[in-house]
Amino acid sequence: MNLTNYVKQVSVEDFGWEFRHQAYWNKRLRTTGGRFFPKDGHLDFNPKIYETFGLEIFRKIVRHELAHYHLYYQGKGYRHGDRDFKELLKQVDGLRYAPSLSNSQSFLVYECLSCGALIRRRRRVNLQKYRCGRCMGKLRLSEKA
């Protein structure tokens, strides 16, 4: 999919205004669906949103970013809290918030061999060096959660 052409198409169909800048995929975006850059007018989009939720949700995110874009160039309130932004977003059926992507960080679960306590950690624990904080028993790697 040529992203810039798709954004131009959505802009004309849903807003009736032309998109004159570039749109890019940005793999570094984690918690947001897209970003508008007023300095040079380009838009960034999160490819994981498109891959995870499909074209219908992605189109609503494109509408959200285009609402920022068009309001900025019309000299109106383009920020999330501005009335102009909220009204335009409602008119074009854009998403107010990006759907959350699942947190890809998993936990390691350690089990105390003495008291059975479960301890969750993101990083590995040196089992030769560390013990249970409750009973000082030995730990063993139980599972990845």
From Swiss-Prot:
Q: Which cofactor does it need?
A: Zn(2+)
What are the residue boundaries of the SprT-like domain, all occurrences included?
A: 5-141
Active site annotated at which positions? 65
Q: Which UniProt keywords apply?
A: Cytoplasm, Metal-binding, Zinc
Where found in the cell? Answer: Cytoplasm
Q: Which GO terms describe its biological process?
A: response to stress
Regarding protein family, the annotation reads: Belongs to the SprT family.
What name does UniProt use for this protein? Answer: Protein SprT-like
Taxonomic source organism: Streptococcus sanguinis (strain SK36)
Q: What is the lineage of its organism?
A: Bacteria, Bacillati, Bacillota, Bacilli, Lactobacillales
